[in-house]
Amino acid sequence: MTRYLARRLLNYLVLLALASFLTYCLTSLAFSPLESLMQRSPRPPQAVIDAKAHDLGLDRPILARYANWVSHAVRGDFGTTITGQPVGTELGRRIGVSLRLLVVGSVFGTVAGVVIGAWGAIRQYRLSDRVMTTLALLVLSTPTFVVANLLILGALRVNWAVGIQLFDYTGETSPGVAGGVWDRLGDRLQHLILPSLTLALAAAAGFSRYQRNAMLDVLGQDFIRTARAKGLTRRRALLKHGLRTALIPMATLFAYGVAGLVTGAVFVEKIFGWHGMGEWMVRGISTQDTNIVAAITVFSGAVVLLAGLLSDVIYAALDPRVRVS
């Protein structure tokens, strides 16, 4: 199993290196960081523009710039922004913000999706299954930013109905919050509910559909009937044998689900005013900053890499054939 995971990790690292190479080269070709400087009125002298281009390394070939960038990136130095600020410093501050959303959203969304999907398969075509299926399809067909705004409107109505600020929907914390550690922690959790719920709903809707189909494929298999014939109750046969087998394809899907959440986090952070990686990505593209976009690509790729590695571990734990081979 260790050799299997080592091979998978090596494959992921190669893909991460390829993603960083393509992102850096393509953004370097598409971006023009000096455009805002050249469009100033009055236009700066050409010597000033050339000096700025030299500072940003724009007077060197793209491959040479990438080689220099990646040689520093492996040591944690992702260069500077076009304004001269260290990318690594801002990256370290924003990673925690985005991971908070991604971890909470993916964990709750995955667990809820698996439970709902398995429950729907066991109670196929009953009222609860039809309701869950309809709701899942409705969430899947609704863009993330629409779901986020609907949750904000719902929070406004709840706050107005109860007469207190039960849900906060702007920023990561309330400015000037007083009190001890528990008060500040409670404030952060209060701000975390709506954005993480937005991501969790999208994840739960997708996972529930796949889990339901996987569970339905298992329910009619011979080993379930054999387990029942040996005296196991239906509940125990489904939980011990059916659900375990149905979770195997879900382990592979987990990495792709996390990749979708990383994309959805861009909209969620902008809508809820969270200063994370998604919001920074939008700013980096608008300012045509290659170093910012490349650094965020490495972060996003690393998150998907870890999710893929975790899915491989879960897959190996669920499927004995992987451990034996």
Swiss-Prot record:
Q: Where is the ABC transmembrane type-1 domain?
A: 102-310
Location in the cell reads:
Cell inner membrane
Q: Give TM segment ranges.
A: 12-32, 102-122, 135-155, 189-208, 248-268, 290-310
Q: Which Gene3D superfamilies match?
A: MetI-like
Its GO CC terms?
plasma membrane
- Domain of life of the native organism: Bacteria
Describe its membrane topology: Multi-pass membrane protein
- Keyword field: Cell inner membrane, Cell membrane, Membrane, Peptide transport, Protein transport, Transmembrane, Transmembrane helix, Transport
Query: What one GO molecular function would you report for this record?
Result: transmembrane transporter activity
Q: What does this protein do?
A: Part of the ABC transporter complex OppABCD involved in the uptake of oligopeptides. Responsible for the translocation of the substrate across the membrane. Glutathione (GSH) uptake by mycobacteria through the OppABCD system contributes to the depletion of the GSH pool in infected macrophages, which impairs the ability of the macrophage to detoxify methylglyoxal (MG) and contributes to enhanced production of inflammatory cytokines.
| Subunit structure as annotated in this protein's UniProt entry | The complex is composed of an ATP-binding protein (OppD), two transmembrane proteins (OppB and OppC) and a solute-binding protein (OppA).
The record's similarity note reads: Belongs to the binding-protein-dependent transport system permease family. OppBC subfamily.
- Name this polypeptide is given: Oligopeptide transport system permease protein OppB
Q: Which organism is it from?
A: Mycobacterium tuberculosis (strain ATCC 25618 / H37Rv)
Q: Which gene encodes it?
A: oppB
